[in-house]
A protein has these predicted regions:
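Minor-groove-contacting beta-hairpin "wing" of winged helix-turn-helix DNA-binding domains
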Residues: 314-319
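C-terminal scaffold of the Radical SAM
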Residues: 1-290
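Short, amphipathic alpha-helical interaction segments positioned at domain boundaries
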Residues: 320-333
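Short amphipathic alpha-helical interaction segments
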Residues: 290-304
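A short, conserved structural fragment
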Residues: 303-313
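Charged substrate- and nucleic-acid-binding regions of tRNA-handling and nucleotidyl-transfer enzymes
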Residues: 281-283, 297-300, 310
Length: 333
């Protein structure tokens, strides 16, 4: 991989997918040693590790920091035990609160996530829960509105009748507005549809995705995007862990596939990602990736409807537009 990427410096490392906090910290230490041996790493590199808030995993936080981790992203999802059980989480609310405090003790940067628009959730209940989360003084929050999609865990649970009494569209919109208002007032404005941060505390790693930057995906089933020789490629490693490991150990190239992205693919990908961001689409970036401009008639209609804003060098979605992002994208693609 080092031979392909060349002398590029690393800005971010992200241990995610599955439950990386189950790894022994010594494994993280060996990975970080190998990374520093192969690439240039800046002094302010962001090293994030996703973690569950169980007491066992939280007990490893100090050793993860010693291994080089400087940011934790904790999968909390709810701050009360009944809802945690409803969504199938094994930790308790007390463990979640303890894990957040432990992470803040050792790491400079801590994020955690919550899911809202859950069963029987009222606007008042969400206001109280989010206020409790903000009182923990995080510098970053990921707040995901529960959506039901086919093929997902929640989709299967919904089809099986295990998610009754979900909020309707009007209440879901009210919950979204409550989220934006509370976080803005607390100094954590939304920089992306579901992500809120204090200034300069945004997730640098996720911004690379949303800005369509280059990133290397390592591990079974990992995806990546790499620009080599002026061509942007989508990479995908084989999903079976044993097959992936054999490919790495034997140096076989077929354990990872790479597809050159067309100009149309790059335009669609950038629009889908950048319109999630408050900063919006940079027109020069869109042109550099795909050689195309957005359709003027579509921009005009969306602007008139109050779904986008526009300046000389960029455009983006308004809060209303982000609520109906799929409709905005249909007009532009």
């Amino acid at each position: 991989m080092r031979a392909i990427t060349g002398d590029r410096a690393l800005d971010s490392i992200f241990f995610g997918g599955g439950t990386p906090s189950l790894m022994p910290p010594a494994v993280v230490d060996r990975i970080m040693t190998a990374v520093r041996r192969g690439w240039v790493c800046g002094e302010d590199i962001e090293v994030t590790l996703e973690a569950n808030p169980s007491s066992v995993e939280a007990g490893r936080f100090s050793r993860f920091v010693q291994a080089g981790v400087n940011r934790f992203s904790i999968g909390v999802q709810a701050l009360n035990d009944p809802d945690l059980r409803r969504i199938g989480r094994l930790h308790t609310a007390r463990e979640a609160l303890s894990a957040i405090e432990t992470a803040k003790k050792y790491a400079d940067r801590v994020s955690f996530d919550l899911i809202y628009a859950r069963q029987d959730q009222s606007r008042l209940a969400w206001h109280a829960e989010l206020s409790q989360a903000l009182a923990l003084a995080p510098d970053h929050l990921s707040l995901y509105q529960l959506t039901i999609e086919d093929g997902t865990v929640f989709g299967r649970r919904h089809q099986a009748g295990k998610l009754p009494r979900l909020p309707d569209a009007d209440l879901s919109a009210d919950l979204y507005e409550t989220t934006q208002d509370l976080c803005e007032s607390a100094g954590l404005p939304a920089y992306e549809i579901s992500n809120h941060a204090r200034p300069s505390r945004e997730s640098r790693h996720n911004l690379i995705y949303w800005r369509c930057g280059d990133y290397v995906g390592i591990g079974p089933g990992a995806h990546g995007r790499l620009t080599v020789g002026g061509k942007r490629r989508a990479t995908h490693a084989v999903s079976a862990p044993n097959d992936w490991l054999r490919g790495v150990e034997t140096g076989r190239a077929d354990h990872e596939q790479a597809t050159v992205l067309s100009a149309e693919d790059q335009a669609a990908e950038y629009l889908m990602m950048a319109l999630r961001l408050r900063e919006g689409v940079v027109l020069s970036r869109l042109h550099a990736l795909s050689g195309r401009e957005p359709p003027e008639h579509a921009l005009g209609g969306l602007l008139e409807d109050g779904l986008i804003w526009r300046t000389d060098d960029r455009f983006g979605t308004t809060p209303r537009g982000r609520m109906v992002l799929n409709a905005v994208l249909r007009e532009l693609l």
